[in-house]
Amino acid sequence: MDANSAHDTARILIEALPYIQRFAGTTVVIKYGGNAMENEELKNSFARDVVMMKQVGIHPVIVHGGGPQIGELLERLGKESKFVQGMRVTDRETMDVVQMVLGGLVNKDIVNLIQHNGGQAIGLTGKDGRLIKARKMVLKASDADSPALQASEIIDIGHVGEVQGIDTRIIDLLAGSDFIPVIAPIGVDDNGASYNINADLVAGKVAEVLRAEKLILLTNVPGLKDKQGQILTGLTTERVNSLIKDGTIYGGMLPKIGCALEAVQNGVHTAHIIDGRVSHAVLLEILTDKGIGTLISKD
């Protein structure tokens, strides 16, 4: 290492130190998905980030998605993927595939990545220890669904659920040890039926119940932008609501923002929308002065 490289390394460590001191002992819930789960270099940089967080005393809790992987396996099985209002119609056969992909393939791949990069992780679904109590999601028809449907009609999209409750005992047990919890967003109801739940919603609810310091949502965009295309680096919940009302925030970003807003309004200190396509995005957001995405706080 030459003198310039050594100087740069020292500068980076010094910049990170106050953040490490500030966040040591706190919990950070990370929704892991998008390109960060598909590119090998990004997968390994994410794993190294969470291992380092654990090493310096920050407790990461990971909730992951897996929509593209589910769609890929369904296609290989000759089963068409259907969506209503952005949600996958999940019949019993599709639910079996969801559980295989999320609870098996994707979850264990993340666990293996973390362990390969020097950490310890345990993979869970919401069915383990009844971690995620679910109820069936009820959708009302919209004009976009079908002209034949009345606006008040209920659409059955099968085993798609929403979070009714989170039992944190198993997360607390793992997070308080050397292990990093890796959670697949599959819930279970009182009758033992399984439900596919949006990973952003699960991450938000887990963050709320754990009273997490941060909720981090990895996305395929660099953050929230204003109407001129400039990144909005710091926003209050009041400002976010005004940006929704004036149409600056719209479309596919609305559910993520809704999840972040609800988390911050219910006890999470800050929520972050960051670009998962950037190597080491998580560490850059929480341990540097500038960060790399949009931070949302209550005031």
Curated annotation (Swiss-Prot):
One of its GO terms (biological process) is arginine biosynthetic process via ornithine. Pfam families: AA_kinase. Keywords: Amino-acid biosynthesis, Arginine biosynthesis, ATP-binding, Cytoplasm, Kinase, Nucleotide-binding, Transferase. It catalyses: N-acetyl-L-glutamate + ATP = N-acetyl-L-glutamyl 5-phosphate + ADP. GO terms for molecular function: acetylglutamate kinase activity; ATP binding. Its main location: cytoplasm. Substrate binds at G66, G67, R88, N196. It comes from the Bacteria. It is found in: Cytoplasm. InterPro entries: AceGlu_kinase-like_sf (IPR036393), AcgluKinase_fam (IPR004662), ArgB (IPR037528), Asp/Glu/Uridylate_kinase (IPR001048), Glu/AcGlu_kinase (IPR001057), NAGK-C (IPR041727). GO terms for cellular component: cytoplasm. The record marks K31, K256 as: Transition state stabilizer. SUPFAM superfamilies: Carbamate kinase-like. Its EC number is 2.7.2.8. Catalyzes the ATP-dependent phosphorylation of N-acetyl-L-glutamate. PANTHER family: N-ACETYLGLUTAMATE SYNTHASE, N-ACETYLGLUTAMATE SYNTHASE, MITOCHONDRIAL. This is Acetylglutamate kinase.
